[in-house]
Amino acid sequence: MSRVCQVTGKGPVTGNNISHANNKTRRRFLPNLQHHRFWVESEKRFVRLRVSAKGMRIIDKRGIDAVLVDIRKAGAKV
């Protein structure tokens, strides 16, 4: 399973670690992903999503039903 948020689409990005001596080494910045179960009242079941912390805030704001419509429209099986 890839490290991508199912709500926002955020994934890893690359950058540099920079030491005190200004030496640069490559690194990855990973999104803050969590596996979370959401209760979907209209379907009377739990849905398990891999979402970032920002994705959880979007679900709180818009509602799980509206977010699931967008996820399913993008072609993901949920």
Curated annotation (Swiss-Prot):
Keywords: Ribonucleoprotein, Ribosomal protein
Domain of life: Bacteria
InterPro entries associated with the record: Ribosomal_bL28, Ribosomal_bL28/bL31-like_sf, Ribosomal_bL28_bact-type, Ribosomal_bL28_sf
MF terms (GO), sorted A to Z: structural constituent of ribosome
Biological process (GO), any one: translation
HAMAP family documented for this protein: Ribosomal_bL28
Full protein name: Large ribosomal subunit protein bL28
